[in-house]
Amino acid sequence: MSLIVLLSGPNLNLLGEREPAIYGTGTLADHVARAELAAAHRGLALEHFQSNHEGELIDAVHAARGRAAALVINAGALSHTSWSLHDAVAAFDGPTVELHLSNPAAREPFRHTSVLAPVAAGVIAGFGGLGYELAVDAVAQLLKGAS
């Protein structure tokens, strides 16, 4: 069974409490459960890791190399600033889908550019919690095409 590693970045542990008008009322646990269910329906395993620390996320990407078939990453604001995370994702040997609950292009200008997008197979943004299911589906399709 292929493994997807789902990574959640800074402040995502506060989902459901922090800015619900932007991020919705669903908690991170709600979104992870939705992703796990979507993965199970597609015959995939899913492992989740959340950290508020850039280095820990980089370590998680490194640990996924050779073990996971794909990454789904919601790096939060690190998506716009972390060249180190960009480099780690670039070194990962499977498809990566970048995920955002909100649509960064419709928000503040500093959110309009993602440093992860150039090393991701695709970006899913603006669909709220549904994005987690869409990201797993995208990864499943990418893995299917790779086999």
Q: Model-predicted segments: where are they?
A:
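Extreme N-terminal starter segment of soluble prokaryotic enzymes
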Residues: 1-4
